[in-house]
From Swiss-Prot:
This is Cytochrome b. The gene is MT-CYB. It comes from Micropechis ikaheca (New Guinean small-eyed snake). Keywords: Electron transport, Heme, Iron, Membrane, Metal-binding, Mitochondrion, Mitochondrion inner membrane, Respiratory chain, Transmembrane, Transmembrane helix, Transport, Ubiquinone. It is found in: Mitochondrion inner membrane. Belongs to the cytochrome b family.
């Protein structure tokens, strides 16, 4: 164990004095993970992974179990809060060039993929209409894989359609994957403290450092408290803010919802999938929407690390954020004009960010050298 890890345990780890609030989202994600694991455990005690009883067991938790409604709402809204924090965490990494710490960034991307899989499995568990049909549509994408597709789909379903074995294995995966996420998170943190965190200026942080405790630990506590307060306000006054009305009806394989869509935090990937009128092409675009995050560490060309002093790249970054929001919005709409065109244009602009960013870095280098 290195000296830095010893300091980390005793809370004396030296940290750059100028790291901003954007650096608090890592600890907020840790808080979210603790909340999701604890509430998930209590929900698992009362949940029944059976297609005839799953929907009733969720209703039972909400109505009959003491404080069950708090557990269920905390878990459901907590998932949305988790993704708000993680998307902000990723955006911060892109803006400040933190992806140059390659292994931290790549381990984070793997964490994101596993987290998305875990959230998807969890969305299926209540066995409501939207849960069932979202699972049908997304798992069906496996059939787009040449030769192996149909076999893989049958293997995942545990039969020739989504049924009891599918729900059982999804519950098992949703229960076990968070422990893998916790393990990988610890690796992510160890890798981060191996090189140390960067700062908003992108300068050498060794020049001016202060102890992590009490300065940054109190800042972490403030942000975590603010986040939990927001969570409880949402749970108390708007518990169904992120829920789909279709999911209040039990899953019916004979009735298709008018508009099938996953949870809001997957809409950007779902929008990219829908924008391509080809099953295999759409599936590849869906995968690439997340996997492309592994590209920036290898395509960074600028001599300056953060976007703080790069106005051209800043414009491109905020275009990416606007594009992300636009794709999310179009994915909530029916597949008809003008939403198809908007979705296709926004999806193209999303991928263009990762191509134009290194070119802009090279142009900025030329301007600086002049």
């Amino acid at each position: 164990m290195s000296n830095q890890h010893t300091l980390l345990i005793s809370n004396l780890l030296p940290v750059g004095s100028n790291i901003s609030t954007w650096w608090n989202f890592g600890s907020m994600l840790l808080t979210c993970m603790a909340l999701q694991t604890s509430t998930g455990f209590f929900l698992a005690i009362h949940y029944t992974a059976n297609i005839n009883l799953a929907f009733s067991s969720v209703t039972h938790i909400l109505r009959d179990v003491p404080y069950g409604w708090i557990m269920q709402n905390l878990h459901a809204i907590g998932a949305s809060l988790f993704f708000i924090c993680i998307y902000t965490h990723i955006a911060r990494g892109l803006y400040y060039g933190l992806y140059l710490n390659k292994w931290v960034w790549l381990s984070g991307t793997i964490l994101l993929i596993i987290l998305m899989a875990t959230a998807f499995f969890g969305y299926v568990l209540p066995w409501g209409q939207m849960s069932f049909w979202a699972a049908t549509v997304i798992t069906n994408l496996l059939t787009a894989i040449p030769y192996l597709g149909p076999t893989l789909t049958t293997w995942l379903w545990g039969g020739f359609s989504i049924n009891d074995p599918t729900l059982t294995r999804f519950f098992a995966l949703h229960f076990i994957l968070p422990f893998l996420i916790i393990s990988l998170s610890s690796i992510h943190i160890v890798l981060l403290h191996n090189e140390g965190s960067n700062n908003p200026l992108g300068t050498n942080p060794d020049i001016d450092k202060i102890p992590f405790h009490p300065y940054h630990s109190y800042k972490d506590m403030l942000m975590a408290t603010t986040m939990i307060t927001m969570l409880f306000i949402t749970m108390s006054f708007m518990p169904n803010l992120f829920n789909d009305p279709e999911n209040f009806s039990k899953a019916n394989p004979l009735v298709t919802p008018q508009h099938i869509k996953p949870e809001w935090y997957f809409l950007f990937a779902y929008g990219i999938l829908r924008s391509i009128p080809n099953k295999l092409g759409g599936t590849l675009a869906l995968l690439m929407s997340v996997i492309i995050l592994t590209a920036p560490p290898f395509t960074h060309t600028s001599h300056v690390r953060p976007m703080t002093f790069r106005p051209l790249t800043q414009i491109l970054f905020w275009m990416l954020i606007a594009t992300f929001i636009t794709i999310t919005w179009t994915a909530t709409k029916p597949v008809e004009p003008p939403f198809i065109t908007i979705s296709q244009m926004a999806s193209t602009x999303y991928f263009l960010f990762f191509i134009i960013n290194p070119i802009l870095g090279w142009i900025e280098n030329k301007i600086i050298n002049k």
